[in-house]
């Protein structure tokens, strides 16, 4: 499965298509600034016809020439549903088993046309063959990724049973189809599962933390939906800095932090 990032480019001013047709590829605010729902300086105007064609052709090329089994879309909530549906339709014409999923978070972005529906969790009914990460299960199992002092179901959170029962049965407010729900406890973003539990349960023994890790795995692997696990999570992967602290955003850390300790 290939991780693809179509929701923004590194530098909108320097991007080749914006050089050829200034402002066409990116969403522009009324004051002339770039829309920045991505937090990366710009948002792709996927709702424009030729931007959509560019993205669809790109994904089809990866599927045709490199035989990808699936695509994971970064911040797909910034792309429109028509583009996503066209991608799925075109790829499935020749590769019907390719899977599609992504981050369907809701973000503010300056779309350039009226009546544009974005590919967010809550619009999942508009993209029936596309799945979304389930942050309800992620945070419900181990605590919020935005507050590492909080507990989750496996670490002893109170009054968590109803929420987790709903997640287990795919009874999510944003989606009723299990095939569109990616259940997980951790991914490359934020802390690993082991580090997140250990960070909030500092008085627990390592043996108990391992049991919590195993309980989380049992939960998302048997729940209604599609299970997803970070590589190494099954062997208690940890990301530790030189000073002994846990690294929660290791994109710029070296192999010592990011490598899987086989």
For each predicted feature, which ranges?
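Short, flexible loop/turn elements at secondary-structure junctions
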Residues: 6, 77, 104, 155-159, ...
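Active-site-proximal helices and loops of the catalytic beta/alpha 8
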Residues: 75-175, 233-262
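Conserved, mostly hydrophobic/aromatic
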Residues: 3, 62, 73, 100, ...
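The substrate-binding groove and active-site-proximal loops of carbohydrate-active enzymes
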Residues: 11, 37-52, 67-79, 197-209
